[in-house]
């Protein structure tokens, strides 16, 4: 009997029956997918494969009616009115983005992760912590790069330091600002102003480009499905894991080469 002919109660009963039968022979039916696994423990770059991208839905594009012609090299074909993204192209561009992140992290660069769609907050925050960078999950403030001093003045803020007794006190120094060395944007269509400001200030960007987006918006496009949280979580996790590995290598090299001064 096919599963679609069973009622929800029958499906639950069948699963419980299979579980009880498997316990008798020492087997356990483990879940195949955990929604938060790619956020808590993302796959390292060595495990990047076509089946991994396929399972995340990275190949699913948008309707052919809203197709952007500049994404033609990324498209494999059409099926039921939507474009199918070539995962071979996704693999090539994703590996290039991984190399870019690796080079930035190797030089202790600042990486900014941006994801402002619903559901992207957890992956953006986790990726920023893993890469020792920063994150934006609410909205991009216009002028954050091109008019940083004015935006900083409107936002306010002050520099705190500790006195001799360890108490925090406010200083007269004005907070300074530093541009990021790389911006990873999970949804470039909703953050066009961020892409334009990055171009004007010569900040390189990595962005997930769906079939309805313009790959020229970012410096290093990654053709993939930007509507799938599983896909965006996977890409953000891969890129942040690369940066984490580079920082771990630097710490290991420091521990190996450090020395003690003679008394």
UniProtKB/Swiss-Prot annotation:
InterPro entries: Ribosomal_uS2, Ribosomal_uS2_bac/mit/plastid, Ribosomal_uS2_CS, Ribosomal_uS2_flav_dom_sf. Its main location: mitochondrion. It holds the Pfam family Ribosomal_S2. One of its GO terms (biological process) is mitochondrial translation. It is found in: Mitochondrion. One of its GO terms (cellular component) is mitochondrion. One of its GO terms (molecular function) is tRNA binding. Keywords: Mitochondrion, Ribonucleoprotein, Ribosomal protein, Transit peptide. Component of the mitochondrial small ribosomal subunit (mt-SSU). Mature yeast 74S mitochondrial ribosomes consist of a small (37S) and a large (54S) subunit. The 37S small subunit contains a 15S ribosomal RNA (15S mt-rRNA) and at least 32 different proteins. The 54S large subunit contains a 21S rRNA (21S mt-rRNA) and at least 45 different proteins. PANTHER family: 30S RIBOSOMAL PROTEIN S2 PROKARYOTIC AND ORGANELLAR (PTHR12534), SMALL RIBOSOMAL SUBUNIT PROTEIN US2M (PTHR12534:SF0). Belongs to the universal ribosomal protein uS2 family. NCBIfam families: rpsB_bact. This is Small ribosomal subunit protein uS2m.
